[in-house]
Amino acid sequence: MLWHLVFILIAILLLTFSPKIESLFKSFTINKPTKTTCYQYTTREQLKSILESDTHETNFCIEKPSISPPKTNSTLLMLCRNSDVFSVLETIQNIQDRFNDKYNYDYTFLNDVPFNYEFIYLVSSIIPHGKINFGLIPIEHWSYPSHINISLATEIRQNYANVPYGDSESYRHMCRFYSGFFYKHELVKQYQYYWRIEPGIKIYCDIDYDVFEYMIINDKKYGFVISLFEYSETIPTLWNHVVQYINDNEIKSELLPLLTNKYNWYNLCHFWSNFEIANLDIFNNDDYENFFQYLDNLGGFYYERWGDAPIHSIAIALFLQKKDIHWFENIGYYHVPYLQCPQDIDLYVKNKCTCNPDEDFTWSDLSCTNHFLNILHN
């Protein structure tokens, strides 16, 4: 009887004080990061403590207080591997020196596997302030969709060995991800604009204005630096399917001439998407989603080698207007093997550029920029 009374008393105490007890235990527990967890730190010792407390298998951010917050809701976006860490560090330092030390924008890093301790620690250490997002790509966004015959796709890849990344499985996953899923990632969709960067790229000029603020003030939705022709072998059926989609949906666009030649057929031109500064709304809408689903169901990402650059470019030509597009001509941008270097000597000196203007790709026979500008400005 006595024990019965004791149990009743304990039950009453637990019901009465359970919120306080739960709070007490929480104060002694290191929680695994949730989808929105953001760790704040001010010293490297605190950063190490944060990293050593968890395996970080999901999406989270690390934040060091910034004196001057960014003016717009934008992020620098990079898809990379743990093994890329040293080229990532070089690129970040370059971007900080040339641009972001002045504007303090967030970085968002995405990977198809969890970022490891070394990557997170080194990257967080080199960025002096602001928020750094580390995200894991959902497996369904980095794998074969159910309608793809994997054996057939594997066999077909061998026929593409003579074109860049032609026999790569991961490259195809990447192109599909950047075509239809990156803007849906929970760490990306919180922003309005993104600037896509890649490991190893270089910025050769000081950027003395806020590129995101410029895009917003001037109502620009898509910005590019370099354009070029796609390898026709990688997209043999893409344009036929696009024409079918245009006809089926009765699409009229003033930008279609960007992608057609004098014979009114596909000219293979595209914006080089390893650099793009864009409004995420150009992808987060029914028009783009329907277009992507149409292409994805055709299987061309795996049965051919459709790239995200032609997909983005075709969508821009279908759904945007001339006034929405901006060419960043004075960035001084390099991604192997092409360079965009300012030709105006006064701007070159003013922005402390260090690239060789004679190696500029913009006006070469392999560039589409002259054609693009003629369409955009007429």
UniProtKB/Swiss-Prot annotation:
The keyword Transferase applies. Keywords: Glycoprotein, Glycosyltransferase, Membrane, Signal-anchor, Transferase, Transmembrane, Transmembrane helix. Glycans are attached at residues 73, 149. One of its GO terms (biological process) is protein N-linked glycosylation. One of its GO terms (molecular function) is mannosylphosphate transferase activity. Residues 26-378 are lumenal. One of its GO terms (cellular component) is Golgi apparatus. It is a single-pass type II membrane protein. The keyword Lyase does not apply. It holds the Pfam family Glyco_transf_15. It comes from the Eukaryota. Residues 1-4 are cytoplasmic. The chain crosses the membrane at residues 5-25. InterPro entries: Glyco_trans_15 (IPR002685), Nucleotide-diphossugar_trans (IPR029044). Its EC number is 2.4.1.-. Its main location: membrane. It is found in: Membrane. Transfers an alpha-D-mannosyl residue from GDP-mannose into lipid-linked oligosaccharide, forming an alpha-(1->2)-D-mannosyl-D-mannose linkage. Belongs to the glycosyltransferase 15 family. This is Probable mannosyltransferase MNT3. It comes from Candida albicans (strain SC5314 / ATCC MYA-2876) (Yeast).
